[in-house]
């Protein structure tokens, strides 16, 4: 749990975010985007970050005229404000074609 200035404890929950990066980017740019979002979580106070680069996969249907996407899964412990700011960054990034965040129970978290 995080401590605030008032010595109140902020409860951290487990979250899983999966986002799709455009498939036409080169590998260096893709890794730069992944590291950028990982550092955003770290700087925002996320704990126990587990990042899984799932690679390029064929999509079942076209999303923003893309038939392939690069899947990235991130499991982390954080608060609601962190998730809101993280999703806002994903929403306005032109290189991200889709994202989804789920809140997880302690029982469902992936052990790393």
Curated annotation (Swiss-Prot):
Domain of life: Eukaryota
GO biological process annotation, one example: translation
Subcellular location: Plastid, Chloroplast
One Pfam family linked to the record: Ribosomal_S6
Keyword Ribonucleoprotein: yes
Primary localization: plastid
Keyword Nucleotidyltransferase appears in the UniProt entry: no
This protein's UniProt keywords: Chloroplast, Plastid, Ribonucleoprotein, Ribosomal protein, RNA-binding, rRNA-binding
Molecular function terms, GO-annotated: small ribosomal subunit rRNA binding; structural constituent of ribosome
GO cellular component term of the entry, any: ribonucleoprotein complex
Family according to the record: Belongs to the bacterial ribosomal protein bS6 family.
Function (record text): Binds together with bS18 to 16S ribosomal RNA.
NCBIfam families in UniProt: S6
PANTHER family linked: MITOCHONDRIAL 28S RIBOSOMAL PROTEIN S6, SMALL RIBOSOMAL SUBUNIT PROTEIN BS6M
Name of the protein described by the UniProt record: Small ribosomal subunit protein bS6c
């Amino acid at each position: 749990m995080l401590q605030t200035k008032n010595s109140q404890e902020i409860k951290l929950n487990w979250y899983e975010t999966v986002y799709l990066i455009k498939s036409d980017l080169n590998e260096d740019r893709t890794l730069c985007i992944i590291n950028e979002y990982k550092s955003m979580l770290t700087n925002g106070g996320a704990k126990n970050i587990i990042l899984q680069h799932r690679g390029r996969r064929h999509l079942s249907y076209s999303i923003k005229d893309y038939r392939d996407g690069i899947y990235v899964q991130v499991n982390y412990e954080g608060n609601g404000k962190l998730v809101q700011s993280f999703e806002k960054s994903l929403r306005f990034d032109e290189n991200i074609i889709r994202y989804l965040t789920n809140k997880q129970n302690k029982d469902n978290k992936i052990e790393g």
